[in-house]
Amino acid sequence: MSERVVVVGAGVIGLLTARELALAGLRVTLVERGESGREASWAGGGIVSPLYPWRYSPAVTALAHWSQDFYPALGQRLLDETGLDPEVHTVGLYWLDLDDQTEALQWARKHTRPLKEVPIEEAYAAVPGLGAGFQRAVYMSGVANVRNPRLARSLRASLQQFANLELHEQTEVRGWLRDGDRVVGVATSRGEIRGDKVLLAAGAWSGELLKPLGLELPVVPVKGQMILYKCAADFLPRMVLAKGRYAIPRRDGHILIGSTLEHSGFDKTPTDEAQESLRASAAELLPELADMQPVAHWAGLRPGSPEGIPYIGPVPGFDGLWLNTGHYRNGLVLAPASCRLLADLMSGREPIIDPAPYAPAGRL
């Protein structure tokens, strides 16, 4: 009989990992303390690219490139399977007035990515509502955004087709089941759940969950707040990014503006100060938004990690314990590659990319 894997955490990383493991023929039990996909996976903007990809390490770049190329097919597959459209919306992205534009263009040439310098007039022609005063632009075609909550819902629905997968929501993990040095399951609010392997994919909460084992995982919550406007469907044809803030168009005319970076522990309370700052950024990017009220304002907790390099693989000294966590600002961006790589390693397949940079060994 195939191995049983207990996956802790049903955000996009946990959902997609469970799917990949089930596709690989393993028996999977997915455990989520609340509802699937309701934490950072719900709260993020959904750009299928790191905000500044040239500023990241080769380790993050390798995961991002594989995932970006995979997302359109994943979106179509989930729509076909479930009837729920994750809305992989390919619109392209303009970066405005970059301080490190030379480095960005060098990175694009090195990695053969379609990022190029364009006349600022082109940006203003493509985005008629763009604020005045921007001097320089670079553009990358093919950059998509995904409707995070719909991606999570479609992933959850897709899991129902697998006879070898169980999902337990409203089930909080409260401890680890041990057999000597081996981790053999989790103690939960609804009883014990055992498996041959246990995979932790609990995002910002991963570090706290590992503390009872004496492990110090440098993954900490980093709060991000966003606001949402409702405009005409054709109001913003492209994504735009300047001074670390971005505007993302959804197909139905919703415009997301983000995001803050705050070290506030596990507090997810939206603040007036952040809304004021985000509204100022919205007005600078798209002045027509200045006279509009946001229709929503929320916060989520990213799993902050050193250099944003996730932990993917087995934990030394704790046989049976695996990690897929610590993706920081790029959980959605890196999810397809991270989860496929994890499934490759766990099932003994040839890995899609070199797993060494992500191994927990030597990093805990």
Curated annotation (Swiss-Prot):
Residues holding FAD: 12-13, 32-33, 40-41, 45-47, 173, 327-333
A Gene Ontology cellular-component term: cytoplasm
Domain of life: Bacteria
Binding residues annotated for substrate, in chain numbering: 302
Keyword Transmembrane: no
GO MF terms held by the record: flavin adenine dinucleotide binding; glycine oxidase activity
Cofactors: FAD
Catalytic reaction annotation: glycine + O2 + H2O = glyoxylate + H2O2 + NH4(+); sarcosine + O2 + H2O = methylamine + glyoxylate + H2O2
GO biological process, alphabetically ordered: thiamine biosynthetic process; thiamine diphosphate biosynthetic process
Known pathway: Cofactor biosynthesis; thiamine diphosphate biosynthesis
EC number(s) from the headed UniProt entry: 1.4.3.19
Top EC group: oxidoreductase
Keyword line: FAD, Flavoprotein, Oxidoreductase, Thiamine biosynthesis
Keyword Ribonucleoprotein: no
Summary of subunit composition and partner proteins: Monomer.
Sequence similarity: Belongs to the DAO family. ThiO subfamily.
Function summary: Catalyzes the oxidation of glycine, leading to glyoxyl imine and hydrogen peroxide as primary products; glyoxyl imine is used for the biosynthesis of the thiazole ring of thiamine. Otherwise, glyoxyl imine is spontaneously hydrolyzed in water to produce glyoxylate and ammonia. Can also use sarcosine (N-methylglycine) as substrate.
NCBIfam families noted in UniProt: thiamin_ThiO
Annotated protein name in UniProt: Glycine oxidase
Organism of this sequence: Pseudomonas aeruginosa (strain ATCC 15692 / DSM 22644 / CIP 104116 / JCM 14847 / LMG 12228 / 1C / PRS 101 / PAO1)
